[in-house]
UniProtKB/Swiss-Prot annotation:
Organism field: Chromobacterium violaceum (strain ATCC 12472 / DSM 30191 / JCM 1249 / CCUG 213 / NBRC 12614 / NCIMB 9131 / NCTC 9757 / MK)
One GO CC term on file: HslUV protease complex
Subunit structure: Component of the ClpX-ClpP complex. Forms a hexameric ring that, in the presence of ATP, binds to fourteen ClpP subunits assembled into a disk-like structure with a central cavity, resembling the structure of eukaryotic proteasomes.
Residues the entry annotates as binding ATP: P124, T125, G126, S127, G128, K129, T130, L131
Function recorded in the entry: ATP-dependent specificity component of the Clp protease. It directs the protease to specific substrates. Can perform chaperone functions in the absence of ClpP.
GO molecular function, one term: unfolded protein binding
SUPFAM superfamilies: Glucocorticoid receptor-like (DNA-binding domain) (SSF57716), P-loop containing nucleoside triphosphate hydrolases (SSF52540)
SMART domains reported in the protein's UniProt record: AAA, ClpB_D2-small, zf-C4_ClpX
The protein, known as: ATP-dependent Clp protease ATP-binding subunit ClpX
Lineage of the organism: Bacteria, Pseudomonadati, Pseudomonadota, Betaproteobacteria, Neisseriales
Membrane-traversing stretches: none
Disulfide bonds: none
Gene3D superfamilies: 1.10.8.60, ClpX chaperone, C4-type zinc finger domain, P-loop containing nucleotide triphosphate hydrolases
Family: Belongs to the ClpX chaperone family.
Length: 426
């Protein structure tokens, strides 16, 4: 090999001193050179600084140019999409802000380590639990995935094991591990995996308490082994390692029957003159009862104490009344009526839904006990024939929906462009 004293003019890295024959690539600058090994070393140094939060790391969609939104800003954004639920929105805003602030300050010089605060959402069906989680993920621009707790089983049994949740999260961000490790996971129907009784069962409960046990480490923070590109696990396979420590887990459920447990606890009184007297039927609504929930109530319902301990932030959602459902139909940024009006506008037709019709839709949703989730099915059924016939019709300018269309299934009012003609049917 030639050296510095030979006739051959060798080029050397200005940083490490290696010759062009000792490295794969030498990059030239103005009177200086750098080898590929030094470039890789520089990249490693910069990457380590970013992970410590000293170099403007992007966390949760925030950066030096786009700082993490404050709790009030998070709440204001949620207000655009979700009606009511003030307590839940405030609780979530603070919890999410603190979670991503914790990631910003990770690797600080002091010894204080900030623990993760996962969230438990308790509220009736159709009250907005899933929408809250989706809206948060959209605002923060982080990967988001919804997992159904009822499909989960213990590892080794038929069904999806808990690590499949992380696999879905990876798929959402094209297997970018760093991005996935800052994501949000919403586990729906968490109440459906409650154990069958308060006492430990002799028989194995693979889809109830077994799943709760499997979720413990995942929620608290562990390194999950995920098959690459969505494949199944098999021996001699390389796995993708995902650290769940910084993933925010939000669990939600309707918890049907929890109100009875809370009422039983609150009605228990002492004996004698000093006992607190309480009425057996104090007329408390589901909303007020849920606001009084204690960890012991959720444990009695069937979630294990260890899981409750890993979900320290509890946010309860209110029952939606008629006024709230009417507002949901019209006020949010992506309100249901606005969606259908947009759909009709693609046919150059204006859609008008009269206030009386909105009231009937809200009343029917209340009667079905489906909350906001039932609004779309009611409106879809009422407009099905119209949406079927409208693309084939000529010169329709406006479609008007009143209460009879919703209640009795009557045809909407059609207003035509030419001559201002009016037709009652298609």
């Amino acid at each position: 090999m030639a050296d510095k004293n030979s006739n051959e003019k060798l080029l050397y890295c200005s940083f490490c001193g290696k010759s062009q024959h000792e490295v794969q690539r030498l990059i030239a600058g103005p009177q200086v050179f750098i080898c590929n090994e030094c470039v890789e070393l520089c990249n490693d140094i910069i990457r380590e600084e970013l992970e410590k939060g000293t170099g403007g790391e992007v966390i949760g969609g925030a950066s030096a140019d786009h700082p993490l939104p404050t709790p009030q800003e998070i709440r204001a954004d949620l207000d655009q999409y979700i009606i009511g639920q003030d307590f839940a929105k405030k609780t979530l805003s603070v919890a999410v802000y603190n979670h991503y602030k914790r990631l910003y300050n990770k690797g600080g010089k002091d010894d204080v380590e900030l623990a993760k605060s996962n969230i438990l959402l308790i509220g009736p069906t159709g009250s907005g639990k899933t929408l809250l989680a989706q809206s948060l993920a959209r605002l923060l621009d982080v990967p988001f995935v919804i997992a159904d707790a009822t499909t989960l089983t213990e590892a080794g049994y038929v069904g999806e094991d808990v690590e499949h949740i992380i696999q879905k999260l990876l798929q959402k961000c094209d297997y970018d591990v760093d991005k996935a490790q800052r994501g949000i996971v919403y586990i729906d129907e968490i109440d459906k995996i409650s154990r069958k009784s308060e006492n430990p069962s002799i028989t194995r409960d693979v889809s109830g308490e077994g799943v709760q046990q499997a979720l413990l480490k995942l929620i608290e923070g562990t390194v999950a082994s995920v098959p690459p590109q969505g494949g199944r696990k098999h021996p001699n396979q390389e796995f993708i390692q995902v650290d769940t420590t910084n993933i925010l887990f939000i669990c939600g459920g309707a918890f049907d029957g929890l109100d009875k447990i809370i009422r039983q606890r609150s009605e228990k009184g002492g004996i004698g003159f000093g006992a607190e007297v309480s009425s057996k039927d104090d007329g408390k609504s589901l909303t007020k009862l849920f606001q009084e929930v204690e960890p012991q109530d959720i444990i009695r319902f069937g979630l294990i104490p260890e899981l409750i301990g890993r979900l320290p932030v509890v946010a309860t959602l209110e029952e939606l009344d008629e006024e709230a459902l009417v507002s949901i139909l019209t006020q949010p940024k992506n309100a249901l009526i606005k969606q259908y009006q947009k759909l009709f506008s693609l046919e150059t037709v204006e859609l008008e839904v009269r206030p009386s019709a909105l009231r009937v839709i809200a009343k029917q949703a209340l009667a079905r006990k489906t909350g906001a989730r039932g609004l779309r099915s009611i409106l879809e059924r009422a407009l099905l024939d119209t949406m079927y016939e409208l693309p084939s019709m000529q010169d329709v300018e406006k479609v008007v929906v009143d209460e009879k269309v919703i209640e009795k299934g009557d045809k909407p009012l059609f207003i035509y462009r030419e001559g201002g003609g009016v037709a009652q049917s298609a």
